[in-house]
Design a protein with these regions (language model features):
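An anionic, glycine-rich sequence signature occurring as long contiguous blocks
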Residues: 176-262, 270, 431, 439-443, ...
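Acidic, metal-coordinating catalytic cores used for nucleic-acid/nucleotide bond scission
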Residues: 159-169, 188-191
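Short, positively charged, Gly/Tyr-enriched micro-motifs
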Residues: 1-51, 105-111
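Short, conserved catalytic/metal-binding motifs centered on acidic residues
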Residues: 12, 31, 35, 64-75, ...
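Active-site-proximal, Lys/Arg-enriched surface segment
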Residues: 32-107
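Electropositive, glycine- and tryptophan-enriched low-complexity nucleic-acid-binding patches
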Residues: 90-147, 237-238
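Short, surface-exposed basic-aromatic patches at helix termini and helix-loop junctions that form
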Residues: 150-152, 171-181
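A short, flexible helix-boundary coil/loop motif
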Residues: 208-211, 288, 295-485
Length: 485
């Protein structure tokens, strides 16, 4: 369903139930209400996290991955049942209510798992308390303890993230206590390196070679030695730091700037898989001991900000009137003085309000427990079980689609720009399903595509798939793919 870009059960009504059902080996596809009921039954078992961890172990083992890309994604909430904390949504440049998901991907953008924050957790907090313990416990490491003991510079694995989790003390803890390396952007860069320090390197990013001007120096932050790599482009120097001592200069740059594959993953999933859609709208309570910023404190701070804006405007008006009074003739002085008196009175009133609001804010706690919040503003959260279930299915679809696209790219000239659009075209094209019981085959005959080069690429991929001898689930029929040309 998701591979066909059918984004919710209701959209099944616009597809032939008989023909769509045959793809799954059924007489007809389930009706929308029936499918929702099935999803609800599966979600009620609360096994989605175990399923995700099982898949993450399998994927990480097959990838032999040692680089994990971490980033947050905000699922904006526009409903009224839940009271969610506001998060900054970078793609909209606004603070909006929503749920924050922290995703773990590889450098190709392929997802492993994600963890949902409860209220307004930051990336650094989630790394320390949730993501790293999960990686250490659930996901197999590429290197054994013996290999780590024999090579003191070898990291267990490397985390790649943006400036949000920047903390030299945290980097020191990761390397000294856990042997985990990091690659991230450096904050507060206050010097410029000489242009003669930079040399041109060829860096491979997403299969395309990019020329970069790079330089490297060692630096020390919080008693931990780091490698600092800078990229020079258009008079701007982008600083990257890492505790990984094994990587070459261009490899560090490649891994840092390949972080955009994760951003592209979020964008692609939103557009093609309706990533942020909810199948259920149930609300759950949050642990009452969780400490959050007091909403009343925020409200007072907002009032204080508005009062100070009015004070600044009155001061600017008063200054202009005083200047005009000096520059004008004596006949205009009474008029200017009258205006100055009015504005001075308003200014004094606002200053008194500022002192009153400041006093009120001092008496208000900056952070409180959720249990101490008034009932009408107390935070809760959306049920994440059904959302996780559908996200796991979408992860599987994305990985399957990407694997198929990579197979196509070996036989297709415009693979970088068009391979995903070709995969979508194949998935949505018509095909004949022909059981051949005499030879124990299930023949899938794809209809011809728009151009001969597309057909040629598909034919070569069909041969690769046929060599795997995959059997249709629940039968002894071997899948045989061919294209009608």
């Amino acid at each position: 369903m998701y591979l066909r870009r059918i984004k919710n059960p209701e959209q099944l009504k616009h597809h032939s139930p008989g023909e769509f059902g045959k793809i799954m080996g059924l007489d007809r596809v389930p009706e929308a209400k029936c499918l929702r009921t099935k999803l609800k039954e599966i979600s009620s078992q609360e096994k989605s996290w175990q399923w995700n961890m099982s898949l993450a172990k399998k994927w990480a083992h097959s990838d032999e991955n040692e680089f994990y890309y971490i980033d947050g994604h905000v699922q904006v909430y526009n409903g009224y049942k839940a009271r969610l904390g506001k998060k900054h949504v970078a793609r909209q440049k606004l603070c909006l209510p929503g749920m924050q998901e922290f995703w773990v991907n590889n450098k190709e953008g392929m997802p492993y798992f994600y963890i949902t924050g409860q209220v307004n957790e930051k990336l650094l907090e989630m790394l320390e308390k949730e993501i790293i313990p999960t990686l250490l416990k659930e996901v197999p490491s590429k290197y054994t303890d013996e290999q780590l003991d024999n090579d003191p510079d070898l990291p267990r694995f490397t985390l790649v993230f943006d400036r949000e989790a920047y903390s030299p003390a945290f980097f020191e803890h990761l390397w000294n206590n856990l042997r985990i390396a990091i690659i991230t952007y450096r904050k507060n860069v206050n010097n410029v390196w000489d242009k003669n320090d930079f040399n041109e390197f060829a860096v491979d990013i997403e299969g395309a070679e990019t020329k970069m001007l790079l330089a490297e120096k060692s630096t020390k932050l919080n008693n931990i030695s780091l490698r600092e790599i800078r990229r020079l482009s258009a008079e701007h120097q982008t600083s990257v730091i890492t505790t990984n001592k094994k990587l070459s200069l261009e490899s560090v740059a490649m891994h840092m700037f390949a972080r955009w594959t994760q951003e592209n993953f979020f964008k692609y999933m939103r557009q093609d898989y309706d990533f942020d859609r909810l199948l259920q709208y149930a609300v759950e309570q949050i642990n009452g001991d969780v400490v959050v910023v007091n909403p009343e404190y925020n409200n007072i701070t907002y009032r204080l900000k508005k009062i100070r804006e009015k004070i600044n405007r009155r001061r600017a008006q008063l200054f202009k009137l005083q200047e005009d009074n000096v520059n004008d003739n004596l006949d205009s002085t009474p008029k200017h003085l009258k205006k100055q008196i009015t504005i001075k009175q308003e200014l004094d009133d606002f200053i008194q309000q500022e002192e009153k609001v400041l006093s009120q804010r001092k008496q208000t706690a900056y952070k409180i427990k959720i249990d101490d919040m008034p009932e009408n503003v107390k935070y809760n959260k959306l049920n994440i079980e059904s959302k996780r279930l559908q996200n796991i299915i979408k992860m599987i679809c994305f990985r399957a689609e990407t694997s198929f696209a990579n197979l196509l790219s070996e036989h297709y000239n415009k693979s970088i720009n068009e391979k995903r659009s070709l995969v979508k075209s194949i998935i949505n094209s018509h095909a004949d399903i022909i059981p051949d019981y005499n030879n124990n085959n299930l023949v899938v005959r794809l209809y011809s595509q728009a151009t001969p080069r597309m057909n040629d690429a598909i034919q070569k991929v069909c041969k690769l798939l046929n060599d795997t001898k995959i059997k249709y689930p629940g039968t002894q029929l071997t899948m045989v793919y061919e294209i009608a040309t």
